Design a protein with these regions (language model features):
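Active-site glycine-centered loops adjacent to acidic/histidine catalytic or metal-binding residues
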Residues: 12, 41-42, 74-75, 148, ...
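Acidic/histidine-rich helix-loop elements
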Residues: 7-21, 47, 88-98, 153-156
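Acidic, histidine-bearing metal-coordination/catalytic regions of metal-dependent phosphoesterases
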Residues: 1-9, 14, 29-33
Length: 186
């Protein structure tokens, strides 16, 4: 059954988690019916530091205990090239490509929408075939992609031609409605 829904999208909370906490509580007050919250990476500044994670969740108390968080890996979760503390925080779908590693990329359907969460810290090629299959095998009306590093950026040095070329072609092929990205702090 198709159920109308909304969601909240944010990214790059890592700098000033107290300020971010205020924003997320405002979003919850303004949109208490939002089905879930998507975070497009950089949830914390130091992904290998437990204190950063404690602060992240503490600042979201009253929101993430009521609404689901849909996280995406950013570069800050890869502190020391190891996102294991990020992976320890969540029980994510284990339906991503084997090449990417467990729970680093995943997809899910909600109502009449497909959400595909990608790990842009890895080469786009490692997830391209799986990404194509997710869209090809879905009958969802609405299609969303979530990843951290921007395909197009307001800063030339942050542009990601690999994401644009490889994932962008797949997004175009399946008429993806929206690509939600982070990293630019815009």
């Amino acid at each position: 059954k198709v159920v109308p829904f909304s969601f909240v999208y944010m990214g790059d909370a890592q700098n000033g988690l107290d300020r971010w906490g205020s924003l997320i509580h405002t979003a919850y007050r303004e949109r208490p019916d939002a089905a879930f919250y998507i975070m497009a990476g950089d949830l914390v500044n130091r992904g290998a530091e437990r204190n950063d994670w404690d602060s992240f969740f503490q600042n979201a108390t009253g929101v993430f205990d009521r609404r689901q968080l849909v996280p995406c890996l950013g570069n800050h979760e890869y502190q020391n090239n190891d996102p294991s503390l990020y992976l320890d925080q969540f029980a994510l779908p284990a339906n991503g490509p084997a090449e990417a590693g467990p729970e680093r990329a995943y997809s899910f359907e909600y109502s009449n929408a497909l959400f595909v969460v990608l790990d842009s810290n890895q080469l786009p090629e490692t997830q391209a075939e799986w990404l194509d299959q997710q869209f090809a095998n879905s009958k969802a009306v609405w299609k969303f992609a979530v990843y951290h590093h921007p395909a197009y950026s307001s800063s030339a040095r942050r542009d990601n031609p690999g994401v644009r070329k490889i994932w962008g072609a797949i997004f175009d092929k399946y008429h993806v409605d929206m690509a939600l990205q982070g990293h630019d702090h815009a």
